[in-house]
């Protein structure tokens, strides 16, 4: 074995041991025991529990009537009627599904993304406790479970956007099937690829002023503690290529595949995020509760690293825009990570009608509410 390979193996062993210690320390804490006082926020902001028993809470979608739908990476989808600062009773809308991470709401129907298909529950709010049998909208997606869970959302063009992750850490998958963002009509027809070279996006939104797509992307593993960065990308039109698997961040050529293409051939990220932070859900904040300087800025849920020493992420960050371009990257809420102990992992963010910001947490199994002032 060469010295280079021995060093690589040793590095991975150290990473693995640290991960074991982190997981061992990260016991599940029930909602009433969560140390919310550990969460640091800018002055004037407050965090509380919106729902304290939502096992595996992941992606969120809000209906115009205020019902919050929550996907999971287990087998269930939940519904939470809005009761103001606290959610109503947790309702199990569906069970027995295949990793129903993604949820989206349109015209009275809930769309749910499994690994390889999109389902639709029609007239769902009239039948939360006894929903109709779902309609299979599209079942043509790959069955790979590696990066197979999906975030979905309807764009301003009325189309449903669906990412398909790379089925690996680093490889050259079929570019027509993997590592991209796709879109289709609400009935599942006219499926087409919108963006390429996207390793694993689990969150996107559209700028409310320009209606252009922005999305997060998770960087590859095993290039070191500080490389590559996760990414916030801007895709104002279809057909753009963001570099995976050849290039990471603005100019990091991949150690396995980078010789095939120069980084200059691809669209660079709008903002490089922290390395291995696992940037997932993101939203442009359009509410009126927060101070004006937060309006139309991007909140990002960073789920947290699994193989970095020391751990990083486990927080909500804010990317500020200036003249339509990403200008700064800062921490908004942190404290879920205490040393090597992570008691919570943010997944998605969702603004409520009153302007409060909800944050889902699949580790603690809760949904937080971040408000400003006494509201």
Walk through the language-model features, giving the residues of each.
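Asp-box/WD-like beta-propeller blade repeats and closely related beta-sheet repeat scaffolds
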Residues: 116-155, 163-166, 195
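Surface loop/turn motifs at the tips and blade-to-blade linkers of beta-strand repeat domains
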Residues: 49-54, 91-96, 137-144, 193-197, ...
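Beta-rich catalytic cores
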Residues: 56, 89, 96-99, 106, ...
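Beta-strand-rich domains and repeat architectures in extracellular enzymes and scaffolds
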Residues: 48-73, 278-284, 300
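Short loop/turn segments immediately following the C-termini of beta-strands
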Residues: 72-73, 115-117, 123, 165-167, ...
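Conserved beta-propeller blade signature
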Residues: 67-71, 109-112, 159-163, 212-216, ...
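Beta-propeller domain segments
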Residues: 30-41, 149, 166-169, 183-189, ...
């Amino acid at each position: 074995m060469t010295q280079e390979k021995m060093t690589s193996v040793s590095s991975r062993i150290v990473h693995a041991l640290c991960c074991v210690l982190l997981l061992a320390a990260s016991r599940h804490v029930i909602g009433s025991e969560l140390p919310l006082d550990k969460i640091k926020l800018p002055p004037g902001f407050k965090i509380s529990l919106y729902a304290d028993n939502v096992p595996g809470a992941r992606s969120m979608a809000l209906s115009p009537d205020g019902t919050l739908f929550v996907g999971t990476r287990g087998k269930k989808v939940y519904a939470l009627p809005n009761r103001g600062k606290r959610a109503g009773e947790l309702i199990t809308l569906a069970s027995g599904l295949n990793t129903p991470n993604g949820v989206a709401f349109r015209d009275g129907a809930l769309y749910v993304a499994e690994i390889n298909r999109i389902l639709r529950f029609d007239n769902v709010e009239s039948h939360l406790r006894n929903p109709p049998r779902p309609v299979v909208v599209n079942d043509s997606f790959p069955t790979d479970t590696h990066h197979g869970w999906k975030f979905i959302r309807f764009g301003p063009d009325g189309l449903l956007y669906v990412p398909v992750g790379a089925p690996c850490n680093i490889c050259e998958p079929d570019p027509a099937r993997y590592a991209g963002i796709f879109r289709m009509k609400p009935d599942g027809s006219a499926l087409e690829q919108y963006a390429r070279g996207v390793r694993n996006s689990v969150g996107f939104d559209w700028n409310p002023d320009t209606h252009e797509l922005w999305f997060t992307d998770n960087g590859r593993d095993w290039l070191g503690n500080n490389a590559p960065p996760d990414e916030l990308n801007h895709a104002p039109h279809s057909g753009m290529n963001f570099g995976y698997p050849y290039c990471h961040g603005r100019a990091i050529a991949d150690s396995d595949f980078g010789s095939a293409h120069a980084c200059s051939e691809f669209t660079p990220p709008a903002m490089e995020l922290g390395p291995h932070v696992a940037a997932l859900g993101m939203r442009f904040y359009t509410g009126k509760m927060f101070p004006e300087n937060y309006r139309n800025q991007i909140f990002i849920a960073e789920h947290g690293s699994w193989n970095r020493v020391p751990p990083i992420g486990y927080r909500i960050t804010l990317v500020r825009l200036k003249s339509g371009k990403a200008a700064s990257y800062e921490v908004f809420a942190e404290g879920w990570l205490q040393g090597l102990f992570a008691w919570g992992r943010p997944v998605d963010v969702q603004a409520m009608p009153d302007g409060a910001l909800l944050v889902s947490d699949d580790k603690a199994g809760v949904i937080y509410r971040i408000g400003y002032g006494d509201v």
